[in-house]
From Swiss-Prot:
Naturally occurring in which organism (per UniProt): Shewanella oneidensis (strain ATCC 700550 / JCM 31522 / CIP 106686 / LMG 19005 / NCIMB 14063 / MR-1)
Protein name (database record): Cyclic di-GMP phosphodiesterase PdeB
Domain annotation GGDEF: ranges: 454-587
Gene behind this protein: pdeB
Membrane topology term: Multi-pass membrane protein
Catalytic activity: 3',3'-c-di-GMP + H2O = 5'-phosphoguanylyl(3'->5')guanosine + H(+)
PANTHER family reported for this sequence: CYCLIC DI-GMP PHOSPHODIESTERASE PDEB, CYCLIC DI-GMP PHOSPHODIESTERASE PDEF
Annotated disulfide bonds: none
């Protein structure tokens, strides 16, 4: 249906009925509002009538109160005078006075309206029953209504004022002309309309209710209500005429310009090579619509041109196909890559252009059939004049209804990228000097290589004298030697072996399914071949040797990575035996087991330091002569496991020294020992503790400053601390150690030379070292009582030290016989199990106080 007919249907079917319906609804609404106004006035008038009645009753009650006392006390003459005055007043019209005395109701004035005797008795009974000092109520006799007010004057007497209410009196209660009639009744008048209502009044007789029945007039509102007359019809006809004129105006001003615009839009071709805008006449809205259409056409043209320029400029080849995989467009790059003109390619199948067989067409059909939203990428070989590796991407083309109408095939020449990737992969996995696998590739291939073997031998090969070549001839010559060694090793291997360069001068070799004897023979052959390699440089000849560590594994318990670690440890043992040696890893070899576990111990030591698991023990040093003024003890170190087990230093000290952890251990021992001294100041006068300093700590940078800072923090006297250094450490770190000892001596600390006699020291070194004590090595002390040579050595050391002013300490004192011999020689102090076993340092004070108490 055309838009003009739609407008006509809208006017006839919607606008005209709407005009009639609105007119009718307005009339109904207005009548409803008038009715609401009438009901509101009725409620207001009822409330007003009730209020006026109460005001009238209150006024009568007030009047009764005024006259009650005089009427009950005046004599007959005075009553006559009062009666004449009352009758002459304007208030006496409908009012009558009565006195209730002895249960009888009597008129006060003779000329007042009489009340029947039965009614009088009923009024008297009601007043007597209520027994109130005053009250006001309504009373109905027949169709006549009265208002009765009573005031008690004496005991049992009441003065009553009775007013008869006529219909005129009742109508005067109303304030508007809305009330037509007011009457009194002792029943509620039933009414089925809202034109009358009833108001309850206080009744003199409780069993006889009295109501004011109010009737309302409908005349004031009848004139304002609307009804369907000729005026309403005229309004409806006028509305219809206006609607008809509006339709004519709409047809001329809107439909005709819109029809012209639609004719122009029907001729628009979005794919036209020339941009032609549409024009509009008539109104601003159609101009906006035309401008929006022109803007859309301009964007379509701009995007079409931009897409065309983009496709012609990009480096990728782009081919558009229809749903049958027939070519409908090719950009210039595709023409160059495929060596075919676009005009010749249109209509051809994609597979025939790329010379890829039906496989490519099937890929296109598969992409269309699945409705893929993501590009489908794959690599193909392009068989042109120069073969190329192409990355092709197929994407579906959708129309506005999300239907697939074709595909876009993007071809990218990745020949150079593939070559570069191959080179990078080779560099990532192979050593550039030897051409062998590097460590990363070796460790990646090792598990797979091991999974296919029944038995496995992992070998760790380390070159000897290779550093000499690098230092003497330079790294270029070293690289040449590495290449020569790699070729020599490869010449001995078959396809079932895996060889790699895993370090500077280190090689890894994996041998599968050979006996230990065959492996040993192969390795000896490799050593022989490597030994034959000679590097000529600067008129010099250089050779290298090999140290080989071997670790064996047998399926199914082959862990290649662990075997490589074991082979590395075995290689260290082979190097220790000399050049061109082979060592096979044996887990029963304690030294190899220690080498293997040393890294774990290093981690455990670092954890113990961090988590405060280092414990201090002490071993007493007893003076053997009367000159010993201070009680001495050596501070020993332990590690407490989380389970509570105590680890002796022999289990971890060697690992700490190998991984340079001793300075941190020494610092923690110093801190804990100084803390213990600071908490036990009662020991400062007569005690001295000995703390061992390792070779790594002797002369270490910052160690003197650390000791000085800890002394300052804990504020302990330096004469309570003696540092022990071993004889070998003092000689190996002679210059740095001497400087450190001098600085600490300035701070007041004393020093002891430990294990004296076990190393290479001479008395000349002893003369140079600023030590206060010499601890004689236990190897000379433990057999002192039965070995004359040991006795002579200990005696000579004691004689020299006495001359030099150095006190001596004998270690490993295990029985009383040794103590006696030491006293004979003149040794100053003794230390060993005969003196006391190591105990926790925290328990020393308690034991010391116990001994003092026992002595006392």
């Amino acid at each position: 249906m055309r838009i003009g007919n739609k407008i006509l249907v809208f006017i006839v079917g919607f606008c005209l009925p709407a005009v009639v319906l609105v007119s009718y609804c307005l009339g109904v609404w207005f009548d409803h509002r008038v009715e609401l106004l009438r009901q509101d006035n009725v409620r207001h008038e009822l409330a007003n009538i009730q209020q006026q009645f109460r005001i009238d009753v209150d006024r009568l009650g007030f009047l009764t109160n005024i006259y009650a006392s005089p009427l009950s006390h005046l004599d007959s003459e005075q009553l006559k005078s009062l009666e004449s005055s009352w009758l002459e007043s304007s208030m006496s019209g409908n009012l009558s006075w009565f006195i209730l005395r002895d249960g009888n109701l009597q008129n006060v004035f003779q000329n007042e309206q009489p009340i029947a005797e039965a009614n009088r008795q009923e009024i008297a009974k009601a007043i007597t029953t209520q027994a109130k000092p005053e009250f006001a109520s309504a009373y109905l006799i027949g169709d006549k209504g009265y208002v009765v007010t009573a005031v008690a004057s004496h005991l049992g007497e009441y003065v009553l004022l009775v007013r008869q209410l006529t219909e005129r009196d009742l109508l005067e209660y109303a304030q508007t002309s809305l009330v037509a009639r007011v009457s009194m009744s002792n029943v509620v008048t039933a009414h089925h309309s809202s034109h009358s209502s009833s108001v309850a009044l206080p009744s003199l007789i409780s069993q006889q209710p009295i109501y004011l029945h109010v009737e309302f007039s409908d005349d004031p509102f009848r004139d304002v209500k609307l009804s369907l007359d000729w005026v309403s019809l005229a309004v409806i006809l006028l509305g219809i005429l206006i609607v008809a004129l509006g339709y004519v105006w709409l047809r001329a001003c809107l439909l005709q310009p819109f029809k012209s615009l639609m004719q122009q839009l029907a001729l628009v071709d979005p794919m036209a090579s020339v941009y032609r805008p549409v024009t509009s006449e008539g109104n601003e809205e159609l101009s906006v619509l035309a401008n929006r259409v022109n803007s859309l056409l301009a964007r379509i043209y701009q995007q079409k041109e931009r897409g065309k320029i983009t496709l012609e400029s990009i480096a990728e080849a782009v081919i558009l196909t229809d749903i049958e995989a027939k070519v409908i467009y090719m950009n210039p790059k595709a023409e160059t890559l495929l060596e075919v003109a676009s005009s010749n390619a249109v209509g051809e199948s994609l597979a025939s252009l790329l010379k890829a067989g039906e496989q490519l067409n099937q890929a296109v059909f598969h992409c269309i059939r699945l409705g893929e939203t993501m590009p489908q990428v794959a690599k193909i070989k392009l068989l042109t004049t120069m073969p190329r590796i192409i990355e092709r991407s197929i994407s579906n083309v959708l129309n506005h209804e999300k239907e697939i109408v074709g595909t876009v095939v993007v071809l990218r020449d990745i020949t150079q990228e593939e070559l570069l990737k191959h080179q990078l992969q080779k560099r990532a996995n192979f050593d550039g000097i030897t051409g062998l696998l590097n460590r990363q590739a070796f460790e990646e291939q090792l598990p797979e290589f091991a999974s296919q073997a029944r038995s496995l031998a992992v070998c760790y090969l380390d070159l000897e004298q290779f550093k000499l070549i690098n230092d003497s001839c330079g790294h270029t010559a070293g690289d040449r030697m590495l290449a020569m060694v790699a070729r020599a090793i490869q010449s001995c291997l078959g396809p079932q072996e895996l060889l790699a360069r895993i370090g500077g001068d280190e090689f890894g070799l994996v041998i599968c399914d050979r006996t230990a004897l065959a492996v040993a023979q192969l390795l000896k052959q490799i050593i022989a071949q490597v030994s034959l390699q000679v590097l000529h440089d600067k008129n010099c000849n250089y050779k290298v040797g090999l140290s080989i560590g071997v670790a064996f594994g047998r399926a199914p318990y082959i862990n290649a990575q662990e075997l490589l670690k074991d082979a590395d440890i075995a290689c260290i043992a082979a190097k220790a035996k000399g050049t061109n040696q082979i060592h096979i890893y044996d887990d029963k070899d304690k030294e190899l087991t220690y080498q293997r576990n040393a890294p774990k111990w290093a981690v455990r030591i670092a954890q113990a330091i961090e988590e405060n698991e280092l414990l201090l023990y002490y071993q007493p040093i007893r003076g053997l002569g009367a000159s010993s003024k201070r009680q001495r003890m050596e501070v020993l170190l332990r590690i407490q496991e989380p389970c509570g087990r105590i680890l002796a230093p022999a289990q971890f000290i060697a690992a700490a020294e190998r991984f340079k952890l001793m300075p941190e251990i020494d610092k923690e021992v110093i801190r804990k020992a100084f803390l213990w001294l600071s908490l036990n100041s009662q020991l400062w006068q007569d005690h001295c503790i000995s703390i061992n300093l390792s070779g790594n700590s002797l002369g270490a940078e910052g160690m003197v400053e650390y000791i000085a800072k800890q002394q300052q923090i804990f504020d302990i006297p330096s004469q309570c601390v003696c540092f022990e250094i071993t004889e070998t450490t003092a000689i190996q770190n002679r210059h740095r150690g001497m400087e450190m000892l001098r600085q600490l001596r300035k701070l007041g600390f004393s020093f002891a030379l430990d294990d004296f006699g076990s190393g290479f020291a001479s008395y000349g070194y002893l003369r140079e070292l600023p030590v206060d004590y010499v601890k004689i090595d236990g190897c000379f002390v433990k057999n002192l009582a039965v070995n004359a040579k040991d006795y002579a050595i200990v005696k000579s050391i004691q004689d020299v030290c006495r001359v030099m002013g150095i006190e001596t300490v004998a270690e490993f004192v295990e029985n009383q016989e040794i103590i006696d011999r030491l006293q004979t020689i003149g040794i100053n102090y003794a230390q060993g199990y005969a003196i006391g076993r190591p105990q926790p340092l925290a328990s020393y004070c308690e034991q010391f106080e116990t001994r003092l108490a026992q002595r006392a």
